[in-house]
Amino acid sequence: MRADLVSPSSAHLSYAIRDIVKFGELVRQHGLDITWENIGDPVAKGEPIEPWIRQIYHDVVDRDESWGYCPTEGFREAQEALAAHVNERPGARISPADIIFFNGVADAVAKVYGFLSPHARIIGPSPAYSTHSSAESAHCALPHITYDLDPNNGWLPDLEDLRHKIQTYPSIAGILIINPNNPTGAVYPVEVLEKIVALAREFGLFLIADEIYIHMVYPGVETAHLSEVALDVPAIVMRGISKELPWPGSRCGWIEVLNRSLDQNFSAYVDSLIAAKRLEVCSTSGPQLAVPRVFGDSRYAVHLSRRAQMFAARAEEAYKALSSVRGIKVHKAQGAFYMTVLFEPGALNGKNQLPIASPGLRDVVERQCKGAAPDWCFVYRLLGSRGICVVPLTGFYTPHPGFRFTLLETDDAKRAWIFRTLAEALAEYLITGEVAA
């Protein structure tokens, strides 16, 4: 071509959650059934949709307006309903105009980072969720700036590290919070959120909160919506229905803009997001019309409570199966539907192995491991040996080796097998390293 077509930003795009699928498919071609524990799709794992939620969408499809375009920011009735839900809580007040719909939270992420000045940086947590870290890196063609989540403190934010990074990098304009956290399953106490808000206030930053899992906090765990604690700091909260209905195929998400009037530059930035959305005309219309009816139904609170209890029980199952394995650290999830296993220092030494019956598949796996990070090698060998697909933790923009798995399997016996097999494979892998050493 007469000109280079490839953006330098493309080098910063990675998504380990899907990247591992390509290798999993290669393993499957060698005759091994694959159990996919890499992606957070409850529907794909067999969770049934509540009949009353299905009926609401059936009714929506019968409305002519669900087949056409909607206003760029979203249907007014959906905006009004969501703004009312925010205003039912103590804290920041918003208007319907502060709700802007996108085609899923991922679309919101792309716009929020894509229309920032390339000189304005957003610091995010590490481990990071790949959609955020890649989008932030790509918008400026630079490595993502992160603050540590402490594995020795329940994966909570290291606030001293956050303060240090803010002071070190004057280009930082905003702080990203993911609560409940993906990939760790941690949920941030109110006082932690308040301290992050205080840092934003002190340094003149805005906040981004990914709250896609905020209605999936387990019983007995206390947290808050950002709108409840960010009373005087401009912020963008990202929400959606992919996880909590669940309806990931709807691609229906939105942002809540908090305290827009406090800063003229922030307000102009929000205007640019709307202008960018206007170029696409609008977001998917049908699911928007379902949101007010689902969220306003008296059965919805029961639905959310049931699912939170269900995932809390599964987290307990996983913790019991894995916590006794030597050489790893496991934090029991407090929200969302993921858990993370962390390898302790020295546990991975290049000598670890898992048996793979097929010589051909073993060769494929070992070729894949050449030059790969140690936790990626474990994931490849786990796939070849046991047929379970998980995501390497270093794929989440962190130096900590480990892996993430889901709590989504609906078949009780199979879920028990998954957790038991993970524990057995880990024990075997780490023991072979000790013997070889």
Predicted regions and their residues:
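PLP-dependent class I/II
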Residues: 1-73, 77, 83-437
